[in-house]
Amino acid sequence: MDVMTAVLTRRSEHTLRAPAPDDEEFAYLLRGASLAPDHGRLRPWRWILLRSGERAQLGLRIAEESGADAAATEALRDKYQRAPLSAALVFAPRGQRIPEWEQLAAASCVAHALMLLLHAREYGSIWRTGQLATSPGVGRFLGLRGSERLLGVLDIGTPEAGTAQRRRVPDDVSATITRFDDLARHRPDTAPQAEDG
């Protein structure tokens, strides 16, 4: 699959089943994804892979914090077992030389590149954030350290047959593009200066 096809056809897959990449295949795909833009080559991220019952613990931690009743606790436990692999992306800023916002952008680029690589190998994925990413209990369960924070969890598996979503038509983005010379004509501080003659 070429890159443009991967970008145009990737979708968030809500229904995922086995197989998912094993640890070796995940590491292989991550090696490719880690070539995403990363000023200073800091790799300000790490991934924690959760399989089997480990995934249910994410929902149980959220349920505990929110004081959920038994039915809600069960629903949250099930919610985080919808995929055979959950990969938690931990943002781990490194030093002050590269601004933290650039390091955060690098971690985000890695996640997107990984999703495209998974799609190219016929895996599905969906990016989950919300309460999961901000839960102190989930952070403790995952062993976050110091300034680390959870950006989200990527659920990974094989899409269910027959759940292919219709292809989206790319939006017209021309209104978001401005040529600088067009912009400069309307700004007095960039207008050409008359030469003395």
Question: Model regions: which residues?
Answer:
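C-terminal helix-cap and adjacent tail motif
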Residues: 5-12, 150-197
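Short, histidine-centered active-site or binding-site loop motifs used for metal coordination
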Residues: 11, 91-94
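Short, charged/polar surface micro-motifs in flexible loops or helix N-caps
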Residues: 52-57, 64, 93-96, 136, ...
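N-terminal amphipathic, basic helical "cap/leader" segment at the start of enzyme domains
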Residues: 1-82, 185-197
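Small-aliphatic-rich amphipathic alpha-helix that forms the alpha element of a beta-alpha
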Residues: 33, 95-141
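Generic beta-strand structural signal
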Residues: 85, 121, 149-152
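Short, electropositive alpha-helical surface patch
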Residues: 138-151
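Active-site-flanking beta-strand signature of metal-NTP-handling nucleotidyl enzymes
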Residues: 86-90
